Amino acid sequence: MKYSANLTALLQTDTVLVAVFEDGSLSPSAQQFDGQGEVSALLKSGDISGKIGEIATFRRQNQRIIVVGAGKPNDINERQFKQITQKAFQAVKPTSAQTLANALTEVQINGRDLYWNIRFGLETIAAESYIFDEFKSKKADPVKLRNVIFHADDKQAQLAVQHGSAIALGVKLARDIANCPPNVCNPNYLAAQAKKLEKQTALLTTAVLGEKEMAELGMHAYLGVSQGSKNEAQLSVMTYKNHPDPHAKPIVLVGKGLTFDAGGISLKPSADMDEMKYDMCGAASIFGVMNALVELQLPLNVIGVMAGCENLPDGNAYRPGDILTTMNGLTVEVLNTDAEGRLVLCDTLTYVERFEPECVVDVATLTGACVVALGQHNSGLISTNDELAEQLFRASQQTQDKAWRLPLSDEYQEQLKSPFADLANIGGRWGGAITAGAFLSNFTKQYRWAHLDIAGTAWLQGANKGATGRPVSLLTQFLINQCQ
């Protein structure tokens, strides 16, 4: 699907979206199509009242006019605008429409501008049109719509389309990878995707470390997790260089890539274990962000790292009670093999020191405790640097890819003490999301660091089961902000 913005398409597309409000008022474009009272008649007859998400349709010559209820004028928030856009697009999908003029750009959203309206609308439409049927013998009927033209034409509108299109593609690619079954998407598959991206642009190169290279570097915590799997662990490093100063320090993004996590010897319950293919959503999101970077060609140096691995029970699997030596020399007593993500990440976070980063942000489906604490709407944010934390929080608010900061203080380190090693890999029952972050902080002393726990936001359950692509939007916005 292609997206653009101009003011000339309103009378040229086969389908148009216009808004009406609860007080009976019409948006400017709705007024334009009310020349013979068609829109007003829908309101008078009660076919539509203007409440959020209501839909009514009429034809005018060769055009299909979809009238969308937009609630109370000048009192519409982001969540309501998303509902308006979703309902509108759901009305378009089953039709034969191929070109759509979207005049919902005229809906005013509290505290937001036209740029935000267009970009958020575009990302919402892209999400609503997402289909993943690669492994179905009978494919879903494709959406006939080919072009969406937003009714606006200034520099901010064009920028919104550019940013939104790149982010929407990044989200789609992240979802595609995450939704793949684990017998397809293993660590080698992640590495192959990174190598494929390298071939698409001169701005990005990819290097892949296998288990031999990791062993030489002393990444024994990472390798300990991988012991039970026949699929070799792979650390995929994507280096994007486009800063005017080639020596500028890179921003490093690290994604946990457990392509399947059975829990190891500390085996997970069988119920919903299939969802543990989503334990690589952190890595998938980093891949999506790097794709968005390539599309936008932002003037930055960024390194994206996907830490691919599997955690399976086997005669060679690591055990509760094992003590592993990490890359930075600290030893870790394994009390639970299902707290494996932090073991993969701690060595990866040590590895990226070599890049002398401006900052490091890791993304991981790390703890069920974070889901208990924050639910499925906000990712958990932990950081040792207030400025970096604020930058990420601001990006989350800009995009509605929400995150909420959790505390991190020395008291939580007390829970990680072990009588036999420098650290234990779990910190007991309380504050599990925070103690996981506290564990990681021991490996981030050389740079500014933040951690996003996406265990509650990376995928949906139930009827809409599947990966969400979060936090691609948040992280891409964070990078865009670095250029301003």
Swiss-Prot record:
Family stated for the protein in its record: Belongs to the peptidase M17 family.
Protein name, per record: Probable cytosol aminopeptidase
Keyword Acetylation: no
GO CC field: cytoplasm
UniProt-annotated catalytic positions: K268, R342
KW Metal-binding (keyword) present: yes
Positions bound to Mn(2+) 2: K256, D261, D279, E340
Localisation per UniProt entry: Cytoplasm
List of residues binding Mn(2+) 1: D261, D338, E340
Reactions mediated catalytically: Release of an N-terminal amino acid, Xaa-|-Yaa-, in which Xaa is preferably Leu, but may be other amino acids including Pro although not Arg or Lys, and Yaa may be Pro. Amino acid amides and methyl esters are also readily hydrolyzed, but rates on arylamides are exceedingly low; Release of an N-terminal amino acid, preferentially leucine, but not glutamic or aspartic acids
PANTHER family in alphabetical order: CYTOSOL AMINOPEPTIDASE, LEUCINE AMINOPEPTIDASE-RELATED
GO process terms (BP): proteolysis
Gene (name only): pepA
